[in-house]
Amino acid sequence: MATHSSSSSSPEVSVAAAETAWSDLRTLVGGEHVRAAIAEDAVDGVVPQMVIEPGSPEEVAGALKIATSAGLHVIPRGGGTKMDWGNLLRNNESRSGELLLSTRRLNRIVEHAWGDMTATVEAGCTFQRFQQTLAQHGQRLALDPLWPDSATIGGILATNDSGALRVRIGSLRDLIIGITLALPDGTLAKSGGKVVKNVAGYDLPKLATGSLGTLGIITQAIFRLHPVPRESRTLSFSNSEGGTSDGGSMNTLALAIQDCNMVPTGVQIRAGSASTPELGLHELDLRFEGTATGCEAQIEQTLRIASGARRIESPADVWNVRSTLWSGAEPSLVCKFSLLPVDLGTFLDLIRKASALLHLPWRLVAQAVGVGYLRIEGSDVAVLLHAVEDLRKKLESRGGSLVILRCPLEIKSKIDVWGSAGDALPLMRSIKAQFDRTGVLNPGRFVGGI
């Protein structure tokens, strides 16, 4: 497990290269925007050597070129909300250390073409600020990511963080239409939107989404926008109301609703063990958006399928419940799973059996039915590791996946948090080599140690 600080490594040539890089970086962005790293900058126990805050896409590209020449590993950081996602950083003891590159100063909303319903924004802009600006013209980026007040656009893209809105509107890859990436060789690659330059024929916006900053550092993105709905209504069904008895029944109801003419913009299933009643044993949440008349018509049609729903007066609490999975007793695991929507009931049964056998409290929030988040708590790290390996094996056998987002470092050192990439891994390594030949960006943190 790599827990070293970069200051503890380095042959003399690497130390000299790092000192030259520090000087060059100060010249590039100004001395006030380069500093020595502190303990709070650590990523999974690795304290970088220095922190830089470029102020433009060109400065990001220039910083990457300097870092590559000096043999520095580069760790991108936006709002810092998901810095513990991914595998352990590959040890850099034979090189010069690590450079943490913050996009904090890249926070401009470059253009809001409200007539075309598109917007261009820099990577360091927070999601909340972006939404507030778009709302002035009655528009929005139709996403509901985690921690919207502090999560940045670049970080949301790098981690592919969508939410319940994807049921109707689509995922992040459906909304991004252009991107600018700073590459390790110091160039800016642009694709989509109004831009003219493509990179080797790749669909760069989709490729960069979810890549955890391992191909290039996102500096700008162009998005397709949607109108802010006039009205929104949230209904919730529970296992004690409406005749449903478990999460599988809730899932069946959710699928039945989506198979009819109703078009909820949010579908969410909440579940938990008896020791986590604050989440509700089994709850199904539906969000309808549009005109008041349209929302009420869809609610009326929904109630013809299943009775016992209650209207939620504070819907923000319901739709933000996913973020509560990051709080609770430790040690714990927080995982993201994906599966066929029809398999969610079976997955819930597997979780219940494992929880009962190993005495592990759990909570689950499934958004878009086939994509969700699971928290498992336990006093023994070895038991947690056994539980997640068993659940992952069973999910992967049915074509699903289980990615560990947060866990103790002891577990991270023993497992690939991403799971198996299967036959896709050689292709992923090939793409990585084309964009980042020397492995400068977030080395080791992506799938298969990429």
Where are these regions (language model features)?
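N-terminal glycine-rich flavin-associated loop
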Residues: A42-I75, N91-E93, L99-W147, D161-K194, ...
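Short, conserved charged micro-motifs
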Residues: E59-G62, R129, G243-T252, T293-E300, ...
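C-terminal substrate-binding/cap subdomain adjacent to the FAD-binding core in PCMH-type
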Residues: A158, I177-L333
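Conserved glycine-rich FAD pyrophosphate-binding loop
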Residues: A2-S6, P11-V13, V46-Q49, L72, ...
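N-terminal, positively charged, Ser/Thr/Ala/Gly-biased leader segments
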Residues: A2-H4, S10-I75
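Anion (oxyanion) recognition and catalysis
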Residues: T68, A135, Q258, A356, ...
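Short hydrophobic/aromatic beta-strand micro-patches
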Residues: E53, S238, R287-E289, S338, ...
